[in-house]
UniProtKB/Swiss-Prot annotation:
Family membership: Belongs to the Casparian strip membrane proteins (CASP) family.
Organism: Oryza sativa subsp. japonica
Swiss-Prot/TrEMBL GO biological process terms: multicellular organism growth; response to auxin; response to brassinosteroid; unidimensional cell growth
Transmembrane stretches, start-end: 8-28, 51-71, 86-106, 129-149
Membrane topology: Multi-pass membrane protein
Protein name: CASP-like protein BLE3
Residue spans, topological domain Cytoplasmic: 1-7, 72-85, 150-162
Length: 162
């Protein structure tokens, strides 16, 4: 049974790493230059702090998901990894939420603040960001499954009640 748990943990963590890396790479490659009424306008992820936070959080999540594969199951480190998984999940949720809020403002603007939507001028950039956000939500969902599975394994080791 321990081999099945290790295999399942590895598959889930590899899926989480792949989804997180995909989200980060897609966001990093989001860029578009366009001309609007004769004014050159460039949009890049690095111009928005929320998008930078998104990239850093998801890159860290991808690296962490790969590094934690080396942690032996049932060890004290596996309990620490579970705690870190929960914290990382909160960071990922914050990153995708903040990037999503900025993306929504770019798409719809904010009439109360007088901010106009910009996605009408930079379609490809906004679509690229949307793809990164979708990958981010997928990564967050997979990470949640990792946390639930790890919680099950750690509590089963502490109290094998069945």
């Amino acid at each position: 049974m321990a081999k099945v748990h290790r295999l399942m943990n590895a598959v889930l963590r590899l899926a989480a790493a792949a989804a997180a890396a995909t989200a980060a790479v897609v966001m990093v490659t989001s860029r578009e230059t366009t001309s609007f009424f004769g004014i050159q306008m460039e949009a890049k992820y690095s111009y928005t702090p929320s998008f930078i936070f998104f990239v850093v959080a998801y890159a860290v999540a991808a690296a962490y998901s790969l590094l934690v594969l080396a942690v032996p199951a049932g060890s004290a480190l596996s309990r620490l990894a579970l705690t870190t998984d929960v914290v990382l999940g909160m960071v990922l949720a914050g990153a995708v939420a903040s990037a999503g809020a900025i993306s929504d403002i770019a798409k719809n603007g904010n009439s109360h603040a007088g901010w106009l939507p910009v996605c009408g001028q930079i379609h490809a950039y906004c679509n690229h960001v949307m793809a990164a956000l979708i990958a981010g939500f997928v990564a967050l969902a997979v990470h949640f499954v990792v946390v639930m599975y790890s919680l099950h394994i750690v509590t089963d080791v502490i109290c094998p009640c069945h």
